[in-house]
Amino acid sequence: MKIAMLAPVAWRTPPRKYGPWEQVASNITEGMVKKGIDITLFATGDSLTKGKLKSICPAGYEEDKSLDPKVEECMHISFLMEQAHEYDIIHNNFDFLPLTYSRLIKTPMVTTIHGFSSPKIIPVYKRFNDINHYVSISYADRSKHLKYTANVYNGINSSHFTFKEKPGDYLLYFGRIHHDKGTREAIDIALKAKMKLIIAGFIQDEKYYNQHVKPFIDGTQIIYTGNAGPEERDELLGGAYALLHPINFKEPFGLSVAEGMFCGTPVIAFNKGSMQELIDDKKTGFLVNNVEEAADVIPLVKNIDRNYCYQWAQSKFSTEKMTEDYIKVYEKVLSL
């Protein structure tokens, strides 16, 4: 079985800091390498893999602003499609644009749908549904307009995270600084609970940051540490009393939620999107509806078994499980 793994080219694969789709593409690729699968990663030229790497884009366009995103994406996708005949399956982690090549190649394409950026893109998925094999990353994110081959939860490389039996004394917000992710709500929760909050993540919305986040940062109770790399992410997640995830949108999957539980850290999340699938309510954290409810459950976090958080994450969101699930998808597609 020869697999071509198509990663995005906004960031390096795996990303140095932020880059969730690139991270998932990397985790799948390295999982396949461990299984002895012949896999080639199509990503930026500075990407890292134990498999084969092919690239036409030198670096991520979000890291090198001299690169034009549309040009890099078109070059990258066509670079793979010109070689499609060399592979048994193309695994698309690049959203909808590669689908438009589906009828021009003979190689079957598996597409992991990492959420819908807008309802406006669904017609593209609908048009190519008959020739593509769609995989959802949570049942909550499925569109009623599409047919799916499987659901495969994102897998986390547990070796990158350290289980901590004893919690620290701070709350953690880990994610991009944006209204969707609820940075301001996390601040409000911490203020109500009278606990220290560490905010880690890149500023995606400068206006939102300046209006709703920056005024509260005092370096004592509310601390902003910037965008965190792998080592700092592990340290922050493992040392937290609880991870706050007060999202304002139906999130397809929250990588930081799973990562936190691998460290043994309970998660307090707004009950939207995939959160019911990620969190075992009252056992690995709490599903709440608003800031007040989140603040109210913070004293109860001490009753959560951090070892159970780890075991739950390992059973559902490990790279090993994700790899096995995708191998089943590949085998199913090739048997058709």
Protein language model annotation of sequence segments:
Residues 1-336:
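Catalytic cores of nucleotide-sugar-dependent glycosyltransferases that transfer UDP/GDP/TDP-activated
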